[in-house]
């Protein structure tokens, strides 16, 4: 089943990097009582994700937060160390929370996983943006093609706030 507007996020664990090292955070800990702009990419450091999607998020981060968003988060099916390196490279001001979905548990649980085995990536997340309020999906913008950022960028979600 694919998640849709009005659905509650499932209970899944992410890995996040903190000052004390890698930590486990549940969807409840991340989303409960908060307004969260969640962006998902197929892979850290991949061309579209790195050169198009992340810049659309970081460029619009201040404006998104000014619209009442508590947290801007980015998730990908990568391990926490890759996500930390990607954050260091794309978001040195730490405007976003990077959520490692290493085994695609979240992507699969919400039905937004994609099999990219043919190009050598394996199971990944579809590219999307989502506005979540207190764990409930309020906006959802899923790309039809994982190689483009036409409706999942920071500018699109900003316009929906």
Q: How would you label these PLM feature ranges?
A:
Residues 1-161:
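Chalcogenol-based redox active-site neighborhoods
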């Amino acid at each position: 089943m694919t998640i849709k507007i009005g659905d509650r996020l499932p209970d899944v664990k992410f890995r996040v990097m903190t000052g004390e090292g890698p930590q486990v955070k549940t969807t409840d800990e991340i989303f409960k009582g908060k307004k969260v702009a969640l962006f998902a990419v197929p892979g850290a450091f991949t061309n579209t994700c790195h050169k198009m999607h992340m810049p659309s998020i970081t460029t619009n981060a201040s404006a998104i937060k000014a619209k009442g968003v508590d947290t801007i988060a980015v998730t990908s099916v990568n391990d926490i160390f890759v996500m930390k390196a990607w954050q260091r490279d794309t978001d040195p001001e730490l405007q976003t929370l990077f959520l490692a979905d290493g085994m695609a548990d979240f992507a699969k649980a919400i039905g937004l996983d994609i099999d990219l085995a043919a190009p050598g990536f394996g199971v990944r997340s579809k590219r999307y943006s989502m506005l979540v309020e207190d764990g409930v999906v309020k906006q959802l913008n899923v790309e039809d093609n994982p190689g483009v950022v036409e409706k999942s960028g920071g500018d699109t979600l900003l316009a929906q706030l």
